């Protein structure tokens, strides 16, 4: 009996409209967290610049195997987790843990942007952008946060429309 354990690999997603909608939703989620002023300026600027760069790189390399990119991203995730664990060691209350956790979520989202070749990966990015919006909402102190939520809802509706035009 000769069983093969690997399944068929999904095709890369070529729909640029869907990719732009996902990138917009992610960027809005990142902006919503950055606007709460719990991150360093350097972290905020890097995240806001690197996420769109990541989506462009991912689009251009969507048909490649990207092993080196995946190894680099795994290393980046280890660094982000190590920074989070280092920062969380000095936390004196559960409320004070929100900022380091927000930074960790932010870096996971940014790093993930560099490897989203398939529709399924784009859907994971949308779920992650939902998490970013929730984190921003948990950190928000005023009702003006609703504007971020509204902008994200528009981008999410755009993604739903784009993903419903063609099914896999």
Short names for language-model regions:
Residues 1-168:
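Linear, non-domain "peripheral" regions
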């Amino acid at each position: 009996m000769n069983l093969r354990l690997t399944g068929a690999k999904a095709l890369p997603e070529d729909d640029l409209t869907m990719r732009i909608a996902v990138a917009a939703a992610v960027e809005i989620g990142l902006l919503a967290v950055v606007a709460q002023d719990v991150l360093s300026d350097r972290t905020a600027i890097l995240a806001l610049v690197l996420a769109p760069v990541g989506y462009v790189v991912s689009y251009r390399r969507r048909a490649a195997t990207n092993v080196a990119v995946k190894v680099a991203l795994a290393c980046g995730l280890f660094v982000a987790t190590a920074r989070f664990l280092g920062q969380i060691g000095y936390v004196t209350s559960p409320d004070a843990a929100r900022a380091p956790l927000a930074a960790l979520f932010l870096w996971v989202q940014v790093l993930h942007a560099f490897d989203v070749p398939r529709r399924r990966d784009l859907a994971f990015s949308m779920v992650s952008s939902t998490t970013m919006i929730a984190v921003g909402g948990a950190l928000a102190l005023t009702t003006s946060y609703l504007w971020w939520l509204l902008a994200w809802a528009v981008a999410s509706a755009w993604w739903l429309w784009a993903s419903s035009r063609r099914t896999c």
